[in-house]
Structure formats: structure tokens, C-alpha cells
């Protein structure tokens, strides 16, 4: 194992500071904050939109970007200009950490190879699942080929859930010894039951705070299966729902819920977001393709029970032994089970309160700092070890060939006899 008092880490992260809503953006921001607190030097390469000069003491380098053709609010950038290569070279990183998949990861790969630096890739968006919903199903296998190419070129891959590890094994992406699970963390101080607010509940309920209130927080995309919530609400008369967030599917969603007891607040941040979480009764997560499920963690940390699909990375947050104690899961597409569990929580205040407190206690164990320490002290060191072994595997055959075909220099031994 390689032990260092201080790493020089270069992070290539798309959509790091822009208005695009995502759990992985929040995850990286918390991760870099903790790296800086542990004394590591960090530079961040990201798209140019809304980029500050620094973040918690980490220098931020913006790269020219352009809108994604299929998802206009997502900026894309290769981050491979001479300026960026020069900045990274001057920084002399011990490791490059890139988010995958995306265009920027190709730039990170090129720079890592050019500068001969170990490369860690963390996989955050399960694109093969989304492709059929946005384009054509026949593109799924080519996407897997791209993923194989990228992650086989990396020294270590981090994934957000056990489900993704299984998918990678099934698709023969990389060997199991080069995959690690990036444990989920939550800011339990910022997402706390103490932020429950009557004023916020009035706002979320359209001035009907005494009505049962379902809350959903996140990015509104077609792939999030938000249509399912319409069917849920059709089965729950007298119940209100609040949507907190934004995204390309918002306009269609507002039309879908027109005339229904629904409120769309738009994006919230900071204490306002903390109040929104804590002021609901039940959080419902219908998405079947969540790799991370950060909003589920934040709701449970706020003391609000969750009813979520048993899919993707959610069972890592609510495992079998915790189901029914910290929150509920339902099978994909099982409307009856979902509605039944929501109804139970909304009609039994004591049970809902107990579950919320148990969820909160569980989330207090999921500390961002502990997860960040594991990556820094264990995963980065494993990547560096693997990279060094790979370098040695390349150099040793070359040395052997040199010894075979190049004559050794004459050496003088003993009393001057040449050998």
C-alpha cells in the first residue's frame, strides 16, 4: 500500500458548478471539501458555466462547453485544450479522478496517459438504462463497448451501488478486483428534522398544511418514471404532493398534474431545501434507474420516511433487514403495494414518527467524511499500486530484451582483467 501525508488530486468533473441538478454533483462537492480538510491539494477541471476561481481552496479550471443535443440543460466538454493540459502538468498530480460516462472522461484519459498519472474513474449515470428512453435500443450495446473501453483503461473504477457492480460483471466491463463500491454519505447536519417548518409546509401544500403531504425532490427527467406519481395520486384522494426541483420534463409534468393538489416549487438550495424535506410526511421515489439515490438519503436524514422502488442503488440505502423499519420498498410497477405503504404511513402518525426517527438514526451513521477517507486512504492507494505494477509489467520485458540484444559494457575486475 502507498501511504502519503498529502495527495495532489486532479478531478475532471462535468456539470460541477452549473445549475444542472444531480446527486453526483453534490457528492463530488462534499468529497472535494473533505479532501481539502484532510490536507490534500486539489484542482478541479469542469465545464465553464458558472465556474468560480476556487472551491474550498481547490483551484477550479473551466473548459469551454456546449449543450448536449438530447438534453439541452447538460453542458458537454472534452477539457483537452493546451491550456488545461498545461495547468494539469504544472500541478503534478499524484492521481486523476474522472467522472464517467461522458465526453470529459475522454479528455481525462488522454491527459492521464500523456502525463503518465494513475487514473480513477467513478461511474455515476447508468446510460445503458436511459438510452431506450431517449434514443434507440440498438445503441445500448455500442454504449457498453464505450464503457468497457473507458474503464479498462482506468486503474480503478468506483461505482455507487451493488447493482451496478453486478451489471458490470454481467457486461464483462472489467475484472472484479478493479471495482470498488463508493459508499453513500449524507450531510446529516444540513438535513435534519429540526428544519421542519410550518411556513414551508403552508407553501408546499398551497395553504392546506393540515392535509397529508407527499414530497418529491430531484431532477425532473423522463427517465425518472415520474408519471407513476400521477397514478399514485389518483388513488389517494385528499392527499397533496409537492415537487421540489427542475428539469427538462417539468413542463410536461405540470400539464399532467394540472387541476390536481400539486405544487411545483422549482429549485431550492441551502436551508430552504432542508426545510422542504423536513416539512413533508412521506417521500416517494418512483425512479427505477437511480445509481446513487442521494435524495432518499437526505429525506431519511430529515426524519421523513421514504417509499421507493426496489431497484438500482436504493436497496443499498434500505437493505432487506431495514425495510419496514427505516423506510419502505415496493417492486417496480407495483402500484397497489406502493399506494398501500404510503397510505399506512399517512394514516398512522405514531408509526410514521417511529419510522422517521429510526431512519434518522440510521443516516447518522453514513458520514461523508468516512466515505471520503476510504477513497483517499484505500482506493487511491490501490489505484496507484495497480498503476505501478502495470508500469513494471511494461518496463521489465523491455529491460529483458535490452539485456538479450545489447552487449553488456566491459567491466574491469580483479587485477585489471577485462570481462
Where are these regions (language model features)?
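Carbohydrate-associated surface elements
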Residues: 163, 185
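Short hydrophobic beta-strand element within catalytic cores of glycosyltransferases
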Residues: 305-308, 318
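A short, well-ordered alpha-helix in the C-terminal region of glycosyltransferases
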Residues: 337, 344, 351-365
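Conserved acidic donor-binding segment of nucleotide-sugar-dependent glycosyltransferases
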Residues: 320-335, 344-349
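N-terminal subdomain of nucleotide-sugar transferases
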Residues: 1-64, 368-369, 390-419
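Short alpha-helical donor nucleotide-sugar binding micro-motif in glycosyltransferases
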Residues: 88, 267-268, 275-280
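Aromatic "clamp/platform" in nucleotide-sugar-dependent glycosyltransferases that forms part
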Residues: 269, 288
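Nucleotide-sugar donor phosphate/pyrophosphate-binding loop at the beta->alpha transition
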Residues: 118-120, 129-149
Amino acid at each position: 500500500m502507498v501511504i502519503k501525508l498529502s495527495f495532489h488530486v486532479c478531478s475532471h468533473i462535468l456539470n460541477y458548478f452549473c445549475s444542472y441538478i444531480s446527486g453526483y454533483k453534490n457528492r463530488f462537492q462534499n468529497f472535494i471539501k473533505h479532501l481539502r480538510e484532510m490536507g490534500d491539494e486539489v484542482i478541479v477541471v469542469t465545464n465553464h458555466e458558472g465556474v468560480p476561481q476556487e472551491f474550498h481552496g481547490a483551484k477550479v479550471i473551466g473548459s469551454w462547453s456546449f449543450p448536449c443535443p438530447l438534453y439541452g440543460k447538460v453542458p458537454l466538454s472534452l477539457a483537452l485544450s493546451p491550456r488545461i493540459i498545461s495547468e494539469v502538468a504544472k500541478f503534478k498530480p499524484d492521481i486523476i479522478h474522472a467522472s464517467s460516462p461522458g465526453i470529459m472522461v475522454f479528455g481525462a484519459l488522454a491527459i492521464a496517459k500523456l502525463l503518465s498519472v494513475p487514473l480513477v474513474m467513478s461511474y455515476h449515470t447508468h446510460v445503458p438504462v436511459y438510452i431506450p428512453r431517449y434514443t434507440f435500443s440498438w445503441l445500448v450495446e455500442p454504449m457498453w463497448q464505450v464503457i468497457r473501453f473507458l474503464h479498462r483503461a482506468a486503474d480503478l473504477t468506483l461505482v455507487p451501488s451493488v447493482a451496478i457492480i453486478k451489471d458490470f460483471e454481467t457486461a464483462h466491463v472489467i475484472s472484479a478486483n478493479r471495482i470498488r463500491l463508493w459508499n453513500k454519505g449524507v450531510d446529516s447536519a444540513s438535513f435534519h428534522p429540526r428544519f421542519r417548518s410550518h411556513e414551508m409546509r403552508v407553501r408546499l401544500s398551497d395553504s392546506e398544511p393540515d392535509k397529508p403531504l407527499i414530497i418529491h425532490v430531484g431532477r425532473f427527467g423522463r427517465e425518472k418514471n415520474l408519471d407513476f406519481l400521477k397514478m399514485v395520486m389518483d388513488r389517494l384522494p385528499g392527499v397533496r404532493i409537492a415537487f421540489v426541483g427542475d428539469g427538462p420534463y417539468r413542463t410536461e409534468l405540470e400539464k399532467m398534474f394540472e387541476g390536481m393538489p400539486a405544487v411545483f416549487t422549482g429549485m431550492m438550495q441551502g436551508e430552504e431545501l432542508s426545510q422542504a424535506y423536513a416539512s413533508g410526511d412521506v417521500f416517494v421515489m418512483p425512479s427505477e434507474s437511480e445509481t446513487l439515490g442521494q435524495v432518499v438519503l437526505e429525506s431519511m436524514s430529515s426524519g421523513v420516511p421514504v417509499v421507493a422502488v426496489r431497484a438500482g442503488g436504493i436497496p443499498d440505502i434500505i437493505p432487506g433487514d431495514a425495510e419496514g423499519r427505516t423506510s419502505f420498498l415496493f417492486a417496480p410497477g407495483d402500484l397497489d403495494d406502493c399506494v398501500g405503504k404510503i397510505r399506512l404511513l399517512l394514516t398512522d402518525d405514531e408509526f410514521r414518527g417511529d419510522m422517521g426517527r429510526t431512519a434518522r438514526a440510521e443516516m447518522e451513521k453514513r458520514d461523508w467524511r468516512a466515505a471520503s477517507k476510504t477513497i483517499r486512504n484505500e482506493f487511491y492507494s490501490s489505484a496507484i499500486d495497480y498503476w505501478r505494477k502495470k508500469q513494471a509489467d511494461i518496463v521489465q520485458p523491455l529491460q529483458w530484451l535490452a539485456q538479450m540484444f545489447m552487449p553488456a559494457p566491459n567491466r574491469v575486475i580483479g587485477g585489471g582483467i577485462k570481462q
